A protein has these predicted regions:
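Feature captures eukaryotic membrane-trafficking machinery centered on endolysosomal pathways
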Residues: 114-186
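Structured extracytoplasmic
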Residues: 1-132, 136-144, 202, 207-208, ...
Length: 258
């Protein structure tokens, strides 16, 4: 989406070619600013993992794109930035690698010495009783997140929900704001797994170019812990694209989005 859009800006430049875009303006729930959705890209994939010998592969089953791609014809620089921004975040790691920097995880081994934690309340998240904690860096000048943790109020201390924000004052190049929201569910076998991973970032690549808001929404489902066919790990490359990934039907995408 184009970020911080004004009615006046829609009368200028490239916007004149797409007058219908005026009706597409909406308010961003993350920033409360006006944004103009330009492009939607979807990917459906399956990830397989083997611990010994260690191997991980992602099989892309479907890809879909809708929108006005002309707005994003800014060369490889934007693509490089987005790949760096939208790295996978695992809060159970001690360190989170993001934007070519190292951030201390709010539940990592070094979290107590790096963050200040405040006990807010006991709340219900879905059907789970959770302790609500907020956290901020001990030193405001340090590279760190601010956010909220919702931890189960029982002996497991499992994380039910985590929200994190990277403020503008952190000084990361191109990034005006970054928000992460992750939610976890318990499987029938007792394991807690990530099910929802939303990341929203406001970018200002160049001062003379319209700011951009990019949102990545990831849904994880169908966790299976049964043995995997060895032949799948013999496929070449870490990312395998199925031959018909660009020709999936509307019915396929309707099922995937549920």
């Amino acid at each position: 989406s184009l970020n911080d859009v004004t009615p006046e800006s829609l009368e200028k430049g490239i916007y004149k070619k797409f007058s219908f875009l005026k009706d597409q303006v909406e308010v961003s729930p993350e920033t409360n600013k006006l944004i103009l959705p330009i492009s939607v890209q979807e990917t459906s994939s399956k990830t397989i993992y083997r611990k010994d010998p260690e191997s991980k592969k992602t099989i892309i089953e479907g890809m879909n794109s809708n929108g006005v791609e002309e707005f994003f014809s800014t060369g490889d620089m934007l693509g490089t930035i987005l790949n760096d921004v939208f790295a996978d975040i695992n809060i159970y790691d001690d360190d989170i690698r993001l934007l070519q920097r190292r951030f201390v995880s709010p539940i990592g081994s070094g979290a107590i010495s790096f963050y200040k934690f405040y006990l807010m309340d006991t709340v219900m998240v879905d059907k789970n009783k959770c302790v609500h904690l907020t956290f901020v860096p001990q030193n405001p000048q340090d590279f760190g997140f601010t956010g909220h943790l919702y931890v189960l109020d029982d002996s497991t201390y499992a994380v039910k929900k985590c929200t994190m924000n990277l403020p503008k004052k952190t000084g990361v190049n191109f990034v005006e704001n970054l928000d992460v929201v992750q939610q976890y569910e318990q499987l029938p076998n007792g394991n807690w797994v990530l099910t929802d991973d939303d990341m929203t970032v406001d970018l200002l690549v160049m001062k003379a170019i319209q700011g951009i808001q990019v949102k990545r929404t990831t849904k994880y489902s169908n966790y299976v812990f049964e043995p995997i066919e060895p032949r799948l790990f013999r496929l070449k490359g870490n990312v395998i694209k199925e031959a018909d990934m660009l020709t999936k039907s509307d019915e396929y995408w309707a099922g995937v989005r549920q």
